[in-house]
Curated annotation (Swiss-Prot):
Name this polypeptide is given: Small ribosomal subunit protein bS20
One of the protein's GO biological processes: translation
Gene it is expressed from: rpsT
Annotated GO MF terms: small ribosomal subunit rRNA binding; structural constituent of ribosome
GO cellular component, one term: small ribosomal subunit
PANTHER family in alphabetical order: 30S RIBOSOMAL PROTEIN S20, SMALL RIBOSOMAL SUBUNIT PROTEIN BS20C
Region (Disordered): 1-20
Pfam families in the record: Ribosomal_S20p
Amino acid sequence: MANHKSAEKRARQTIKRTERNRFYRTRLKNITKAVREAVEAKDVNTANEALKLANKSIHSFVSKGFLKKQTAARRVSRLAQLVNTLKAA
């Protein structure tokens, strides 16, 4: 248990940040999973919609400081490549 006022505040902040990061991490996994499942099902329309949502969400995570800019770009790029393989086939 914290003995100083500043340590107590830090403990509270850590709990809040952990919860927030868990929410973002789960959301990121679910969004990515939706795109991958749509591609596996060979559903072009659903894959495009999921990719659009993923792109929007991932870039919003950058503005909130959860992801770095290059990490977000890489993730979106890989998902787009995956969807484009569906269009080519």
